[in-house]
């Protein structure tokens, strides 16, 4: 298997109105890779949560903060890294405060402030968090579902 990848990097102001731009870019990349509609929606939710956390918690009132997003496009997976240089938090402690989760728990039983991390871990195949000099969230979604054929044309439909 090849380890070749294409990388797409974005740096946006840490403001809520820019999260939509990240979602649109992600949707385009994931669609081009062949993810299903449901997988793309899962990706958008998880990445939006990571970006929203950076916007809301990293810089507090500082309007000059930035969020960096990197998409690693591999043959078998999409890796998304969301990073900020703002305030860090203790991920292990936060996870301990939140969990454990069981299927019998309903969403309204989850601890306040931890739903984003829970969603990221539930919707993505891998999630890693580093909290040195800001917070970096690395998420991976493997491509294993049906691929969307992007070479489909009207002519292809007419011949079938």
Curated annotation (Swiss-Prot):
One of its GO terms (biological process) is negative regulation of DNA-templated transcription. InterPro entries: Anti-sigma-factor_SerPK (IPR050267), HATPase_C_sf (IPR036890), RsbW (IPR010193). The higher affinity of RsbW for RsbV than for sigma-B, rather than a difference in the concentrations of RsbV and sigma-B, is the driving force that is responsible for the switch of RsbW to non-phosphorylated RsbV. The kinase activity of RsbW is directly regulated by changes in the ATP/ADP ratio. Keywords: ATP-binding, Kinase, Nucleotide-binding, Serine/threonine-protein kinase, Stress response, Transferase. One of its GO terms (molecular function) is ATP binding. Disulfide bonds: none annotated. Gene3D superfamilies: Histidine kinase-like ATPase, C-terminal domain. It catalyses: L-seryl-[protein] + ATP = O-phospho-L-seryl-[protein] + ADP + H(+); L-threonyl-[protein] + ATP = O-phospho-L-threonyl-[protein] + ADP + H(+). It holds the Pfam family HATPase_c_2. Changing residue 14 to S: In strain: IS58. It comes from the Bacteria. Its EC number is 2.7.11.1. Induction: By heat shock, salt stress, oxidative stress, glucose limitation and oxygen limitation. HAMAP family: Anti_sigma_B (MF_00638). Homodimer. In stressed cells, forms a complex with RsbV. The predominant form of this complex has a stoichiometry of 2:2 (one dimer of RsbW is bound by two monomers of RsbV). In unstressed cells, forms a 2:1 complex with sigma-B. Negative regulator of sigma-B activity. Phosphorylates and inactivates its specific antagonist protein, RsbV. Upon phosphorylation of RsbV, RsbW is released and binds to sigma-B, thereby blocking its ability to form an RNA polymerase holoenzyme (E-sigma-B). Belongs to the anti-sigma-factor family. This is Serine-protein kinase RsbW.
């Amino acid at each position: 298997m090849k380890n070749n990848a294409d990388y797409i990097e974005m740096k946006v102001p840490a403001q809520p109105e820019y999260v939509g731009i990240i979602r649109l870019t992600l949707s385009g990349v994931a669609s081009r890779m062949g993810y299903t509609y449901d997988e793309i929606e899962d990706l958008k939710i998880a990445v939006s949560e990571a970006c929203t956390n950076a916007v809301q918690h990293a810089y507090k009132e500082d309007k000059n903060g930035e969020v960096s997003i990197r998409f690693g496009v591999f043959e078998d997976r999409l890796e998304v890294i969301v990073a900020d240089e703002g305030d860090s938090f203790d991920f292990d402690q936060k996870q301990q405060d939140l969990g454990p989760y069981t299927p019998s728990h309903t969403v309204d039983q989850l601890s306040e402030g931890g739903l984003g991390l829970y969603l990221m871990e539930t919707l993505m195949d891998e999630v890693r968090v580093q909290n040195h000099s800001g917070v970096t969230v690395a998420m991976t979604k493997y491509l294993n579902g049906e691929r969307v054929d992007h070479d489909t044309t009207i002519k292809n439909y007419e011949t079938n």
